[in-house]
């Protein structure tokens, strides 16, 4: 189970939860509400090195396709195959069981530029 107590957010509507140098990443509830029912998810390969801002995942809904960006630099160490098989998991639990991938952080200092829950709620109004 993902602890949402220390969750951080990006302005691109990703969430990140870091435990022991590994970041779990997904899209926010707000993002999945804007996209609507998800029908396809393209996950990255484990072992891929990504830089902050790189498009890492593609999510497709009946409305649109959207990239999910890396919130920090790191190496993909795990992907959530369950969401590739059943994208509706993201609609059901975007900030929980609908997580997308996990990154081994390259620089924890990059976390300081992310938003806390109050900052994100202010962003989305």
UniProtKB/Swiss-Prot annotation:
Cofactors (names): (R)-lipoate
UniProt keywords, alphabetically: Lipoyl
UniProt-listed GO biological process terms: glycine decarboxylation via glycine cleavage system
Pfam families referenced in this protein's UniProt entry, alphabetically: GCV_H
Details of cofactor binding: Binds 1 lipoyl cofactor covalently.
Transmembrane residue ranges: none
Keyword match Transmembrane helix: no
Domain of life: Bacteria
UniProt GO cellular component terms: cytosol; glycine cleavage complex
Residue stretches making up the Lipoyl-binding domain: 22-104
Sites of N6-lipoyllysine modification: 63
HAMAP family: GcvH
NCBIfam families: gcvH, PRK01202.1
Family to which this protein belongs: Belongs to the GcvH family.
Function statement: The glycine cleavage system catalyzes the degradation of glycine. The H protein shuttles the methylamine group of glycine from the P protein to the T protein.
Complex formation: The glycine cleavage system is composed of four proteins: P, T, L and H.
Protein name (database record): Glycine cleavage system H protein
Species this protein is from: Brucella abortus (strain 2308)
Record gene name: gcvH
């Amino acid at each position: 189970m993902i602890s949402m107590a220390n969750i951080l957010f990006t302005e691109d509507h990703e969430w990140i939860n870091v435990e022991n140098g590994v970041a779990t990443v997904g899209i926010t509830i707000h993002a999945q509400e804007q996209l609507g029912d998800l029908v396809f998810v393209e996950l990255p390969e484990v072992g891929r090195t990504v830089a902050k801002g790189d498009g890492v995942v593609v999510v497709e809904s009946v409305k649109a396709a959207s990239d999910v960006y890396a919130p920090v630099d790191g190496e993909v160490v795990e992907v959530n195959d369950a969401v590739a098989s059943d994208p509706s998991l993201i609609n059901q639990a975007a900030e929980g069981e609908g997580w997308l991938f996990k990154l081994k952080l390259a620089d924890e200092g990059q976390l300081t530029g992310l938003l806390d829950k109050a900052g994100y709620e202010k962003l989305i109004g």
